[in-house]
């Protein structure tokens, strides 16, 4: 798919994690023209302009499921369509596992597609210790893939380096969100003097493929920083899926003036052999506004199977034999009789 690099691009953050990430992205110079935010909790809007928000309200105080959140969001469909507007490309960014992100991400992506936009889901997957959220995350990831032209999967566990013993849970989430922003912003960077941006077409050419696109990050400040960062990114990718199954990739290098052309060439030339996918189609971008610590962000696509298959055991067992796998919509108990069916 070819899209004008100056096409109208929107990003929609959903739920706590999605809103925090999109809010931080909005402060950077990216290939995104406008930003919107959707949540069931008005506390999520504390760092954003309220005119860009859509609040999904529930008249009853009840723990919501993803299906209930979608049911409540039906009344806001027109406002979501307004948020999409005339965008040619819409990035739908949400944390998977909670009711809001899991429920709304596939729904918002389907609305964007209905509006004629290219919907690209960005799914933030839960930490390993958040085992109770895995089922919601797995089901929502699959439905987001069905509702979008492509899905980028961001794994919180992969984003995190070693943390100290006194790290709080809030600090852990904050650090993961900032790491996601750093990686995503390097890939969505606008062209500027002295740097080589990827551009929208190259990004979409990688993401809009069968299966899933996986994000892997690594950094190094050693004398062999390019080789070390590449190795680290491939190792991280291998924790999510079989690297040999990758068909396309974009790699973004963020460093300073010490990053040499031979080092950039080494990463691009060796990525195929490092993943074991010799026919890998590689695009790349370079940003020299970073530090001597090289950050490498890798997007690899074409994965039909990932570690997240185990998050949705029913789909794994039944496969294509699932009889009814459409998105379900529900309402909190007591509201069903208040809502017309037409």
Ranges and model annotations:
Residues 1-342:
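Tubulin/FtsZ superfamily GTPase core signature
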